UniProtKB/Swiss-Prot annotation:
Pathway: Amino-acid biosynthesis; S-adenosyl-L-methionine biosynthesis; S-adenosyl-L-methionine from L-methionine: step 1/1. It comes from Methanocaldococcus jannaschii (strain ATCC 43067 / DSM 2661 / JAL-1 / JCM 10045 / NBRC 100440). ATP binds at residues 141-146. Catalyzes the formation of S-adenosylmethionine from methionine and ATP. It comes from the Archaea. This is S-adenosylmethionine synthase. Its cofactor is Mg(2+). It catalyses: L-methionine + ATP + H2O = S-adenosyl-L-methionine + phosphate + diphosphate. HAMAP family: S_AdoMet_synth2 (MF_00136). Gene3D superfamilies: 3.30.300.10, S-adenosylmethionine synthetase, C-terminal domain (3.30.300.280). InterPro entries: AdoMet_synthase_2_family, AdoMet_synthase_3, S-AdoMet_synthetase_arc. Belongs to the AdoMet synthase 2 family. Keywords: ATP-binding, Magnesium, Nucleotide-binding, One-carbon metabolism, Transferase. GO terms for biological process: one-carbon metabolic process; S-adenosylmethionine biosynthetic process.
Length: 406
């Protein structure tokens, strides 16, 4: 029998607390660029391994570093003078022994990784010439033999945990969390870019809620070629402000929402957040995997969080990735139950044990006033057991890109 613990949590729900802080680093932020590349490389390797061998081989590509380039932005269009440098690191199965033929088969790990990284950058950074403005250096090496052995022992079985680690998830998102998340997603949507192409991809949204007032502070790169002067820059800022105000009315009805964009700008000196490429990575701002958003897309100091860098870790047995995603999936389903205000889930693994048999799966529930936790407990356990029984579905969701890791 699995060790699933369900208990009532006697604390104020997040919406009833006096303050709340929420952050999201957008797709063009250097840290998020690294997260996105790491995950894209992992998915590409999964597909390559599956095509060649019908199974996913050992890999972890969660070590991506970005070193900022050098640019000279100016109204009407500036220039990149030094490229952005991206290091792909980590470990992967680069060769296997064909026992029937008694020969070593070399696998195209490096070329697969570089191709995946380039394709991701071209998709996300609309104003970057990836072939000219970016150097991609692949240094992915062969995996550790003991961890490869854990992989080998689990073929045709439920995978064995590669580490003793934990995952954390909660649901539902608060109004502030949804507003922060959806603001960045909207500003980086095709719809918005087509209407206001000057908006770059490097967007950071910080939300502060004080009672029924939410203050959004948005750092938003503006692409220089689309603005001829400071007046056109101001117009872009005001257009975006109006768009975010309209979005806030839909998401945060009943709240006073105050919006600040690029608060470090000095219009008199014409010192503003102007970029050539739409990302601060062009000008010395560096990035790493795992320094930004958690798997639910947010940084939430008022909620439980794991410090695990999920992006790029293998989706087969790396519990640091799987359990964080799984915890959120379980929490979301439990939060839909009648009588549940909030749900918090923590899952602990034990290295070498099947990942569908965690050492502990802890569920904390804030209930509606008239509901007893004893009535909710069996349903919550049923949901947790169902997800654990179908844990291989989580692997599939990750490989197909159906769940986010940042």
């Amino acid at each position: 029998m699995r060790n699933i613990i369900v208990k009532k949590l006697d604390v104020e729900p997040i919406e009833e607390r006096p303050t709340e802080i929420v952050e999201r680093k957008g797709l063009g932020h250097p840290d998020s660029i690294c997260d996105g590349i790491a995950e894209s490389v992992s998915r590409a390797l999964c597909k390559m391994y599956m095509e060649k061998f019908g199974t996913i081989l050992h890999h972890n590509t969660d070590q991506v570093e970005l070193v900022g380039g050098h640019a000279y932005p100016k109204f009407g269009g500036g220039v990149m003078v030094s490229p952005i440098y991206i290091l792909l690191s980590g470990r992967a199965t680069m060769e296997i022994l064909d026992k029937e033929k008694n020969e070593v088969i070399k696998l195209p790990v490096g070329t697969t990784a570089v191709k995946a990284a380039k394709e991701y950058l071209k998709k996300v950074l609309r104003n970057v010439d990836v072939d000219k403005d970016v150097i991609i250096d692949c240094r992915i090496g062969q995996g550790s033999m003991d961890l490869v052995d854990v992989f080998e022992r689990q073929k045709n079985e439920v995978p064995l945990a590669n580490d003793t680690s934990f995952g954390v998830g909660y649901a539902p998102l608060s109004t502030t969390e949804r507003l922060v998340l959806e603001t960045e997603r909207f500003l980086n949507s095709d719809e918005l870019k087509n209407e206001i192409p000057a908006v770059g991809e490097d967007i950071k949204v910080m939300g502060l809620r004080e009672g029924k007032k939410i203050t959004l502070t948005i750092a938003m790169a503006v692409v220089d070629r689309y603005v001829k002067n400071i007046e056109e820059y101001k117009e872009v800022i005001e257009k975006v402000r109006k768009k975010v105000e309209d979005l806030a009315k839909k998401i945060a009805d009943g709240y006073e929402v105050e919006i600040h964009i690029n608060t470090a700008d000095d219009y008199e000196r014409e010192s503003v957040y102007l970029t050539v490429t739409g990302t601060s990575a062009e000008m010395g701002d560096d990035g790493s995997v795992g320094r930004g958003n958690r798997v639910n897309g947010l940084i939430t100091p008022f909620r439980p969080m794991s410090m695990e860098a999920a992006s790029g870790k293998n989706p087969v047995n790396h519990v640091g990735k799987i359990y964080n995603i799984l915890a959120n999936l379980i929490a979301n389903d439990i939060a839909k139950l009648e009588g549940v205000k909030e749900c918090y889930v923590r899952i602990l693994s034990q290295i070498g044990k099947p990942i569908n048999e965690p050492k502990a799966l802890d569920i904390e529930i804030i209930t509606e006033d008239s509901y007893d936790i004893k009535d909710i407990e069996p349903k919550a356990k049923e949901i947790a057991n169902k997800w654990l029984d179908n844990i291989m579905e989580v692997q599939k969701m990750i490989v197909e890109g159906k769940v986010t890791t940042f």
